């Protein structure tokens, strides 16, 4: 008997994650998508990964662009997260954006960011893992935007609020 995918989704929804916007450039085109399936794979050598649905337009951009930036969102960036979670073209026009070393857009007001060169793509079911080598990065001050139980959340005194359970 196969494991129930909806049960897996419910279980993983109990795992609080940070919220990021993954950005990339392919030629003159830039794109971005909200992602919480982002991991630090290795410190030696430095490697990170983002998991992207094969049906998402971002999949093609990442595959062809060869680079990406992980922009970790601040607590007050819920609107940015929602913007990049929607399908279709992405509007960067009102955001402060810098071009990273790889050419990927960096959200200047992000809590932290990594600019990565794509080094490998691993097929994993209906999603692929894009492995990146960080070439540059920075951190800022503030609280992160979290995602828990299908909702945006925040840290309270070092713990996730329990009134959302």
Go through the PLM ranges and name each one.
Residues 1-165:
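Basic, polyanion-binding surface patches
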């Amino acid at each position: 008997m196969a494991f129930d995918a909806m049960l897996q989704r419910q279980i993983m929804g109990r795992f609080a994650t940070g919220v990021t916007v993954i950005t990339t450039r392919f030629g003159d085109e830039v794109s971005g998508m909200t992602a919480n399936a982002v991991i630090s794979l290795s410190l030696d050598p430095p490697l990170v990964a983002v998991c992207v649905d094969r049906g998402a337009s971002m999949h093609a951009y990442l595959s062809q662009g060869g680079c990406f930036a992980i922009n970790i969102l601040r607590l007050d960036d819920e609107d940015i997260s929602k913007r990049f979670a929607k399908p279709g073209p992405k509007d960067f026009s009102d955001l402060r954006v810098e071009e990273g070393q790889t050419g990927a857009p960096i959200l200047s007001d992000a809590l932290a960011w990594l600019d990565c060169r794509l080094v490998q793509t691993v097929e994993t079911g209906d999603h692929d893992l894009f492995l990146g080598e960080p070439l540059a990065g920075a951190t800022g001050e503030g609280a992160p935007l979290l995602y828990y139980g299908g909702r945006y959340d925040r840290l309270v005194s070092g713990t996730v609020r329990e009134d959302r359970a």
